């Protein structure tokens, strides 16, 4: 069988040229040891302890002395040295030394041939690996399972997966017992080549042939199936595996439960969870994590809380990642009471204290639901526990205060952030500018903006758009336009929001021609207009009483797949009521 594989390669080994000159300082001790050395001296110098501490230069020097000694050390001694060099990943040197041995008439054995085969497989030079296998077998050496595993790995990495499968089948036919390395190597290769069904078939075929894969092999196949989104096949394989008297462990159950939860097979996941407990397999944190997360995703908050309580009663302590993910899930759904309870559980457990991420999540939740003072309380508690807030912490609070129209406290938090040595990033500054502008503090925003420019901060388009809008709303449309025109010089490209903001400024000032010109420029050279752009211009034309221009814009907007927004509908409805518009406008928008 192996002869049919090995016959592929018949070429001689490529000649490697390596200068065997070690560093005189590092090899001196070896040279002294082998001055007039016998093969017994070699054996002593190749003890396990010496080889463990061997450096490359010393190994080269030692080889030089070994080939000078008479009689030559045995091939076993040479094998030990070559193996030590191979462990240094110096395979080119191993090949070169092997060639020198051959030229000196030192015959290789099974072990050295296996090293060479492993080298060529790692280098994806399979034809040379097969040539050595053929030569080895011609000399009467049958390959070991280690050698065949090297060849198998070479086939898998060399995109010759069908030959890898055939090799394993032939191994079984010839009486070899594939080990864990054999199976896992082939399984990983099959999954890398999107051959999941063949991986399952391989396991089933091996069982029929009386070559039972072990738990590790089943685990590799099940893991691969779940990663590919086929947890139902993994579940079937688990059932077959257990019928074959191979008991799955908690890792395999966790893998399938996680896969079932990810792909929304929640009932199957809980059935498996119950089966697991019935069989006496104790669940751990990795069992509960996907189940609780899945319940949260389906909005089954009370069930999630019950399962969490069950977990804690069993003294299964969630890790920080689990707690943080769960707190985040509660916060996103507005379940702040549940999030606080979970936080309290973290503190009580004493196994897992809240970190900055947990505090930031809670603060974000309070700020999102306009409870920024409670967010500040969490921040103070965090500081009392010795944790220092990061950029996200302060930025979240600043944003929260601005949303609550509390401009003074927002600025106070910003000042505290700077005094605490936490560096604001561009997002912090953008939120500060936006908050100041929206609260009527444009002059303060301009001071901050000027400071940012003087510090050579890398301002983004959000920064510039915010300031253009603020200037336009403050009646400084010319200054807004100057800033817009400077963007190209700054290497910043305006986006659709920037164009729309500038057009809105022109329209607010009654500069209809400038708005039209910018709209034309936008369609020719800039980003494509969006719904906001069209609705901004339509409302401006309606306010000017230009029904014809409004109608044309509505038609163009609809042809681009956009519709009127709430503000435009509101304006049209009001104008219909007081008789300034015909009902046809409403029909055009709908």
UniProtKB/Swiss-Prot annotation:
Keywords: Mitochondrion, Repeat, Transit peptide
Family designation: Belongs to the PPR family. P subfamily.
PANTHER family to which the protein is assigned, alphabetical: PENTATRICOPEPTIDE REPEAT DOMAIN CONTAINING PROTEIN-RELATED (PTHR47942:SF16), TETRATRICOPEPTIDE REPEAT (TPR)-LIKE SUPERFAMILY PROTEIN-RELATED (PTHR47942)
Chief localization: mitochondrion
Protein name: Pentatricopeptide repeat-containing protein At1g63070, mitochondrial
Subcellular location: Mitochondrion
Parts forming coiled coils: none
Gene3D superfamilies (alphabetical): Tetratricopeptide repeat domain
Lineage of producing organism: Eukaryota, Viridiplantae, Streptophyta, Embryophyta, Tracheophyta
NCBIfam families: PPR
InterPro entries reported for this sequence: Pentatricopeptide_rpt (IPR002885), PPR/CCM1_RNA-binding (IPR051222), TPR-like_helical_dom_sf (IPR011990)
Superkingdom of source: Eukaryota
């Amino acid at each position: 069988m192996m002869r049919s594989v090995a016959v592929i390669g018949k070429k001689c080994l490529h000649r490697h040229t390596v200068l065997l000159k070690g560093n005189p300082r590092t090899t001196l001790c070896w040279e002294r040891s082998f001055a007039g050395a016998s093969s017994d001296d070699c054996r002593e110098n190749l003890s396990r302890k010496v080889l463990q501490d061997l450096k490359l230069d010393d190994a080269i020097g030692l080889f030089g002395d070994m080939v000078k000694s008479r009689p030559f050390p045995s091939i076993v001694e040479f094998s030990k040295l070559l193996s030590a060099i191979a462990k240094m990943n110096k395979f080119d040197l191993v090949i070169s030394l092997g060639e020198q041995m051959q030229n000196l008439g030192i015959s290789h054995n099974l072990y050295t041939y296996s090293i060479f085969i492993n080298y060529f497989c790692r280098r994806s030079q399979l034809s040379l690996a097969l040539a050595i296998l053929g030569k080895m077998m011609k000399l009467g050496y049958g390959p070991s399972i280690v050698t065949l595993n090297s060849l198998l790995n070479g086939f898998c990495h060399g995109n010759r997966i069908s030959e890898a499968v055939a090799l394993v089948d032939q191994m079984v036919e010839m009486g070899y017992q594939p080990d864990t390395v054999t199976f896992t190597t082939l399984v990983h290769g099959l999954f890398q080549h999107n051959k999941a069904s063949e991986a399952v078939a391989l396991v089933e075929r091996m069982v029929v042939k009386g070559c039972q894969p072990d738990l590790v092999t089943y685990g590799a196949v099940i893991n691969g199936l779940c990663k590919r989104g086929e947890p139902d096949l993994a579940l079937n394989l688990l059932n077959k595996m257990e019928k074959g008297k191979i008991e799955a462990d908690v890792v395999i159950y966790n893998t399938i439960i996680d896969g079932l939860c990810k792909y929304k097979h929640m009932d199957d996941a809980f059935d498996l969870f119950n089966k697991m407990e019935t069989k006496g397999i104790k669940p751990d944190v990795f069992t509960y994590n996907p189940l609780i997360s899945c319940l949260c995703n389906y909005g089954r908050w009370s069930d999630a809380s019950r399962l969490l309580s069950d977990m804690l009663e069993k003294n299964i302590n969630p890790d920080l990642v689990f707690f943080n993910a769960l707190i985040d899930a509660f916060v996103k759904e507005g379940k702040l009471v549940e999030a606080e309870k979970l936080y309290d559980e973290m503190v009580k457990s004493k196994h897992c204290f809240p970190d900055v991420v947990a505090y930031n999540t809670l603060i974000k939740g309070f700020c999102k639901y306009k409870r920024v003072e409670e967010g500040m309380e969490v921040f103070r508690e965090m500081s009392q526990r010795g944790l220092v807030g990061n950029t996200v912490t302060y930025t979240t609070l600043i944003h929260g205060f601005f949303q609550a129209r509390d401009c003074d406290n927002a600025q106070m938090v910003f000042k505290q952030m700077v005094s605490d040595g936490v560096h604001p990033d561009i997002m912090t500054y953008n939120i500060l500018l936006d908050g100041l502008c929206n609260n009527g503090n444009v002059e303060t925003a301009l001071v901050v903006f000027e400071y940012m420019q003087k510090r050579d901060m890398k301002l983004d388009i959000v920064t510039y758009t915010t300031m253009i809008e603020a200037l336009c709303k403050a009646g400084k449309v010319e200054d807004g336009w100057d800033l817009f025109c400077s963007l190209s010089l700054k290497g910043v490209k305006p986006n659709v929001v920037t164009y729309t903001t500038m057009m809105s400024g022109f329209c607010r000032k009654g500069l209809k021609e400038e708005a039209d010109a910018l709209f034309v420029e936008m369609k020719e050279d800039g980003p494509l207009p969006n719904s906001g752009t069209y609705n901004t211009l339509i409302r401006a034309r309606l306010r000017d009483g230009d029904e014809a221009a409004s109608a044309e814009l509505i038609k163009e907007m609809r042809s681009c797949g956009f519709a009127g927004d709430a503000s435009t509908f509101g304006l049209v409805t009001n104008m219909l009521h007081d008789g300034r518009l015909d009902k046809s406008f409403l029909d055009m928008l709908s």
